[in-house]
């Protein structure tokens, strides 16, 4: 037999086997994620209000909705319903600060103190761990009296990888934490101002973040408090995260103390030091979201898989991914408290629970799920086979997705409340 004939015969044999195989893929019909009217996704109160309106046509990507907010203070993109709530809630704060910046007292304070935005400080607030090594040469030039405490802060942040996380956390607490409380009055002013405005001091909104920088620096350098009053709070203005406001920690605790608190909590969960370092150093997690993730995970203490969940979170590549994982863990906490206890976290691409009855529990903080190849692959996951499967979504499924999930044996729960009913003191 000629070589070419043998190759052709081998190819045909493989092709026939594939066609006859019971696991051979069959043609499947998928959806193109639609553009939807905004009112089908969110309540009217989030679509228009004092100084803002949301574009009526909202593109979706198969999981999330992408909103455009047009306002008197700029145009903002929100790549999920959660981010829409947050960004809409920040607009009154931006408007209030705009108004206050024109007041006589503020203008005089700026003139006397030549207060300017602090670029390095603003970066540190948004990504505290990622930029802490640049503190003495960055923010340090504005606060010359940091002195020895500032040098120890740098040492704590640049400790060799082999140093125990507990040792680094303790040193960080006794040096950097005290320095932040006593010397970084700027940071304290920023948190206090954010609390007055009911916004996240670690917001990634560039407009609001810059305003918080300007006002906090003015108040710190002029020794004059900035007082604001928001007359109208739009729905969602307290939505620092989709799951719940992170108690009052993000407002009342110095940044360094929050970092140490998170480190210690992860150590108590027996997360390896190298994983803690990778997670704490991931710049896509705003400190508020990082704190929420750790707080939620702590409520699942003792359940196998928590370490793997932190490992996965350390690989998040965007704020949207960070919030998704944080909210998913928060929803698992709610299920654990109100439905059936979770006995294990299954961490393979996502953070999924298995409850005491053996059911697979998928908590999905998504907006609108279309039946795409990606969603189909997830719904057909072989490691879910043989178990009762439930999926809980904060948003909704397309009709095709709903039908296909149910046909595959999934129990579907849509538009669930993601807020865990937990005691903040736990």
Which ranges hold each PLM region?
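Bacterial N-terminal signal peptides that target proteins for export
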Residues: 2-12
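N-terminal signal peptide c-region/cleavage motif recognized by signal peptidases
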Residues: 21-22
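Cationic, glycine-rich low-complexity segments
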Residues: 28-160
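Amphipathic interfacial helices
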Residues: 95-148, 171-234
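Membrane-engaging insertion elements
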Residues: 140-161, 241-281
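Acidic-basic catalytic patches of nuclease active cores, encompassing PD-(D/E)XK
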Residues: 265-350
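Conserved catalytic cores of phosphodiester-cleaving nucleases, focusing on short active-site segments
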Residues: 323-384, 388-393
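Domain-level recognition of nuclease-like catalytic cores that cleave nucleotide substrates
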Residues: 396-426
